[in-house]
């Protein structure tokens, strides 16, 4: 019988209370992990003004992003709150806040089969 994980419900205070982790060795880039399993992950990414994530690709996962606040350049488009981006696996991209006041982005890495 398959084990079912319990649902996760977080208020805005609960999200704010999550551990803020640096993303690799990048200055000005942090994230909070909301949920993860063996092949997928959801979280909140913060890129401070004047910083960028750096060009990279996710070899095995689709990347979904929804801009929550602020602005950033993603795939060459200047995106603000409410904007959504889907990046298929293998596509190089960046999250660039070097010319904006920074941004907060909800992200989901999803395995192609999931």
Regions found by a protein language model. Give the residues of each.
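Glycine- and acidic-residue-biased ligand/ion/polar-headgroup-sensing regions
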Residues: 59-74
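Well-ordered beta-strand positions
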Residues: 35, 66, 86, 96-98
């Amino acid at each position: 019988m398959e084990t079912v994980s319990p649902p996760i419900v977080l208020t805005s205070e609960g999200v704010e209370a999550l551990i803020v982790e640096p993303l690799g060795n990048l200055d000005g880039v942090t994230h909070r992990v909301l949920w993860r399993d063996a092949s997928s992950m959801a979280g909140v990414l913060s890129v401070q003004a004047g910083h960028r994530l750096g060009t990279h690709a996710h070899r095995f996962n689709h990347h979904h992003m929804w801009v929550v606040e602020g602005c950033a350049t993603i795939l060459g488009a200047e995106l603000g709150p409410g904007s959504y981006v889907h990046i298929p696996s293998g596509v190089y991209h960046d999250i660039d806040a070097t010319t904006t006041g920074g941004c907060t982005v909800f992200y989901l890495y999803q395995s192609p089969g999931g």
